[in-house]
Amino acid sequence: MQVIRLAALSDNYIFLLHDSHKNIAAVVDPAEAEPVLKQLAQLKAELVAIFNTHHHNDHVGGNQKLIQKFPQVKVYGGAKDQGRIPGQQVFLQPGDRVQFADRVAEVIFVPGHTRAHIAYYFPPQTDDTPGELFCGDTLFAGGCGRLFEGTPAQMVESLTKLRSLPENTRVWCAHEYTLKNLQFALSVDSKNTELQKRLDEVKTKRSQGIATVPSLLGVEKLTNPFLRWEQPSLQLAVNSNDPVQTFARIRGLKDKF
């Protein structure tokens, strides 16, 4: 399974999954249809599935046009998003599995950004290959999503689930927010040398127009403050020794950054 990253809107990423043996494709969070249709035409591939992580328009905005072009496509989303995702046919529960070609993804319930948010995790096929995590707006490179419908406690629980995946997991998040995220992270975790090193690398990449997605989960665990709420340095920075309160205070600071 090849993952093709497509830029969309101002800072979104759409992910096209392509199986070259069957020449079929699936798409994760089509913010708009045009980049997907263009890539499918180049591949001469058939779209068989739309995997939505949540209902926000910059993740589902392309659904209807893709359905019109490929009437047999199946549209997947969380069960709690029923009525909010255009064209949704499959209503996924936590722990469900979805298949694309010869790969099977686990559905992880990750409320916080929205009340119904899910992530799709394709485990590695061999010991020396990475798993693939499509996490929408729950976990970002260097950050996490705003809490529009969920609570800090829910988001901590959701991020704990994602944090427990193998460290070589590739994190396919839906926005190019990494530079600003890491600039904020350094403001609350200023003595983190791994973070400073990563920020310097990201500055160079972005100055050259290079994408910073995917990232690796192991790197996130070392540098992303929203996965590090137990760290004494971060707790000291926000004057809290409670994990949920620490997370909430860091999130509050980020909202104003």
From Swiss-Prot:
The keyword Zinc applies. It comes from the Bacteria. GO terms for biological process: methylglyoxal catabolic process to D-lactate via S-lactoyl-glutathione. It is an enzyme of class 3 (hydrolase). Its cofactor is Zn(2+). SUPFAM superfamilies: Metallo-hydrolase/oxidoreductase. GO terms for molecular function: hydroxyacylglutathione hydrolase activity; metal ion binding. Thiolesterase that catalyzes the hydrolysis of S-D-lactoyl-glutathione to form glutathione and D-lactic acid. This is Hydroxyacylglutathione hydrolase. It comes from Nostoc sp. (strain PCC 7120 / SAG 25.82 / UTEX 2576). The gene is gloB.
